[in-house]
Amino acid sequence: MAMKRALLVLVAISLSSAAAGDILGLFSSDKLTDGSRYAFAPSKSDRSVIAIDTADGEIAAVIEIPHVPGGVVATNELSLLVATDPENNAATVVNLYNREVIAQLDLGMRPDVVLPNAYDRFVTFGSTDGSVSIWDLSTSQQVFRYDGLESATLLTYSFDGGLLFAVEPTQKQISVIDMARKEKVAEIPLGGEADPNAEVSALSRSADGYTGYVSITSENRIAVIDLVDWKVIQSLSVGKGPIRPFSTTDNRYVLVPNRDDQSLTVIATTTRNVVATVPTNIEAREVNTAWLDTVAFVMPAQGDEIAVIDLQKFRAESPIKLPGRSDDGIVTSDSKTLITAIVETGEVAVIDAQSRNVSALFDSGTASLEGIEIALSNNVCH
């Protein structure tokens, strides 16, 4: 009987605490702090960012900000959303607990790209003019700025966040910036002569973080890079017009979408041999994997179909038809769901990765969405 009374007291305390928390806003449905659940898509027509509930397949909130957003990133530990303001060389920081703007960052440079650091506390802005600016979101202060790169839009952090890799296409090299030393510490040549017309992708990491992959798009090859010794260890010929590679989360394969010949090259990470080239029949803009890396979704640069590739049998399945061209895709951290926006209409599509079917399609309330992001995803290589 005493134990029953104790249990009842604990339940009563829990319920009263929950009620008090609700009053204080600690359990408010307005919170958008679950980094694996909520995705964020910047409107390209309104001063807002759309929060998407990936679990329920619906719009969770419309976050109003003082400007039309450029790119966005969300942090998990700090529960913050950062939206760039390229026209004013600035960025806005929003608290996801209450959706209030808590800081406006004067960057002193145009933020053409934005990406989070692995530590979750820092955010990096890059410009086509070759400047990188790193900010501490816990203090809303700039940590340091590095200038003088050819371009600073093709950026990737190392697995632990201690290094920033900046691809410089014309020079066909990667500049390595050390976060602790706040300076460039190395340059990694990608092979070949400098070329003002060269097209090169950003670097992608293997799942373990030891190996990097860069597509030299204009030369139909990828460079395989030792990210410990900072050197190219192999150059592999792939299809025509390869874009940014993608490493599967199980570290078995590297996937290279070939834009110009509409195919997907599959490379085994252990042998670095091409194991398959699968027709996609679309001009690719990126690739994502889902359902425990058994399926790849190739997102289109144009057109209204997503290519579906079976990674167990290395063959194409029926494509997924959408009502318009899709944005980039994000895959939830449980690998079950692909989320994308329809660029021209502002609709959001939720795709079940197991069945390969659209499970939900809903209006976001804004005319155009592009650049969907989530704090915690199935993507381990970017």
Report residues per predicted region.
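Predominantly soluble domains enriched in secretory-pathway, periplasmic, or organellar proteins
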Residues: 12, 16-382
